[in-house]
Regions:
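Membrane-water interface of transmembrane alpha-helices in multipass transporters/channels
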Residues: 299-313, 376-387, 447-448
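Alpha-helical transmembrane segments in multi-pass membrane proteins
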Residues: 27, 282-290, 313, 317, ...
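Interfacial loop-to-transmembrane junctions
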Residues: 407-426
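Juxtamembrane boundary at the C-terminal end of a transmembrane helix
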Residues: 435-448
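Hydrophobic packing positions in regular secondary-structure scaffolds
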Residues: 1-262
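Non-transmembrane, extramembrane segments of multi-pass ion/lipid transporters
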Residues: 115, 242-276, 326-350, 405-411, ...
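Core alpha-helical transmembrane segments of integral membrane proteins
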Residues: 270-340
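Soluble-to-membrane junctions at the N-terminal ends of transmembrane alpha-helices
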Residues: 268-285, 343-362, 386
Length: 448
């Protein structure tokens, strides 16, 4: 277990050995080891490392772990570490931290770093402004290639962590175009940048949403994209890697929300009360939704007591219809995230899902009807449960495909609310169909 060796080195107060051991570890082993350390050991670890090495370590671990450690650290030490982080990482961590602690850290950061991060934390995390970095190469169009080379050589240490693939050319801060490093290498030192610049540059606004950025990386295979404000001023660059990382995080959050866990990422190292509260948010709502569905059974309890066999098939009809509906929900959520459908296309999606629901409903209805007939030898019972499952599947699939679009149209989170709403509808409708058909059969035939 890698964390045991790490604890030994921390307790022995051996910073060089700690650094060497961390460098020898895989990223996943580092993440696991940090999660196994006690809080005091985590703090001591970051104290033993240099600010630069500590920043590199924090970049590897989940944001929750990083902010949890930094909030317990002296603000001066935390500020020294923040100075070594990329600007987007600074903003991400500070927005997750306690406001008082975050303010104290910003006040002790280097003036340039503090000014940069203050601008970034004003943006929503899932916008271009919130994802962009401010470490990029930018030069005025009137400068020469020689000026650029001189600046890069003079401040080599400053630019060592910058990506030197692209150089952005500006005029009074406004983006004019872009150059690749090879353009500089092939040009004369006396050449002005406005002569060799590529002016047909693609950019995004600082208010661009994550979904718009995802569409961008799907359309263009760029290292990154420059971010502008309404006046065309170059503010930063959103890296392709950061967009893909944000996309992955969004998918993880949506997966948790479909299971009724709200409030973002959950890790078992988080406080028990926080984890409990996030899970209870929808569990408590589900109590009332399930009571609503169960009320249908209560209304038909005389029918159910007369035909005990129905009690066996009710959960099957409910579960199978729910599974079919959730498949449609998953497809709609996926297509919404990819921009393949729009919230106003409810009728189109309903028609497409209705045909699938009809076909699958017939197949599932025949199968469950055959099971009922083989078990009880009753044709009426097989028609009741088969017909109920067929119709409920059609309803579940048709509605399941449209619920995410309707929720998105009204500004609600489709990943969070689609599942509980669909479950309630399929349960109520499935119970209603089965028990209503059974009541009619009893009235007409007297027995089943």
């Amino acid at each position: 277990r890698p964390w045991e060796k790490l604890v030994e080195l921390i307790e022995a107060d051996q910073p060089e050995q700690v650094k060497e051991y961390l460098q020898s570890m895989k990223t996943e082993d580092i993440v696991l080891s940090i999660s196994r350390l006690e809080k005091k050991e985590q703090l001591l670890l970051l104290t033993l490392l240099s600010p630069e090495d500590a920043a590199e370590l924090l970049d590897d671990i989940p944001e929750y772990h990083a902010t949890d450690i930094l909030e317990e650290m002296e603000s001066s030490r935390a500020a020294a570490i923040f100075n070594e982080l990329d600007s987007d990482e600074q903003a991400d961590l500070l927005t997750e931290m306690n406001e008082k602690e975050a303010t104290a850290i910003i006040e002790q950061m280097e003036p340039g770093e503090a000014e940069s991060v203050r601008r970034l934390i004003k943006y929503e995390a899932d916008t271009a402004g919130g994802l962009m970095i401010t470490e990029f190469l930018s030069f005025d169009k009137e400068q020469t290639v020689g000026d650029v080379v001189h600046e890069l050589r003079k401040n080599a240490e400053k630019y060592e962590d910058y990506n030197l693939q692209y150089i952005y050319v500006t005029a009074h801060g406004r983006l004019e175009g872009v150059l690749q490093m090879r353009d500089l290498l092939m040009a004369s030192l006396q050449a002005r940048l406005d002569v060799i610049v590529h002016s047909d540059v693609i950019s995004v606004m600082d208010s661009a949403t994550l979904h718009e950025l995802i569409n961008f990386v799907n359309d263009y295979d760029f290292y990154g994209v420059p971010v502008l404000n309404d006046d065309g001023v170059l503010l930063g660059v959103v890296l392709r890697s950061d967009i893909l990382e944000a996309k992955s995080e969004l998918a993880s959050i949506e997966l948790l929300e479909t299971q009724g866990i709200v409030g973002g990422e959950e890790l078992r190292t988080m406080p028990v009360l926080l984890r409990s509260r996030r899970r209870l948010s929808w569990l408590t709502v589900n109590i009332f939704l399930n009571v609503l569905a169960a009320s249908v059974i209560a209304f038909h309890q005389d029918t159910l007591s007369s035909i005990i066999a129905l009690a066996v098939f009710l959960p099957i009809i409910s579960d199978m219809s729910g599974c079919s509906g959730n498949q449609a929900v998953a497809v709609s959520l996926r297509e919404l995230s990819l921009g393949l459908i729009r919230p106003f296309e409810v009728a189109r999606v309903w028609l497409q899902e209705f045909s699938v629901g009809l076909l699958n409903g017939i197949v599932l209805g025949v199968l469950i009807g055959a099971v009922a007939y083989l078990w009880k030898g009753s044709l009426v019972l097989s028609l009741i449960v088969g017909g109920a499952l067929m119709l409920n599947t059609i309803v579940a699939v048709s509605i399941g495909g449209t619920i995410p679009l309707i929720l998105r149209r009204f500004g609600a989170d489709p990943a969070l609310a689609s599942g509980p709403i669909l479950t309630t509808i399929t349960d109520m409708f499935g119970f209603f169909l089965t028990l209503t058909f059974a009541s009619l059969a009893l009235t007409h035939f007297g027995t089943i």
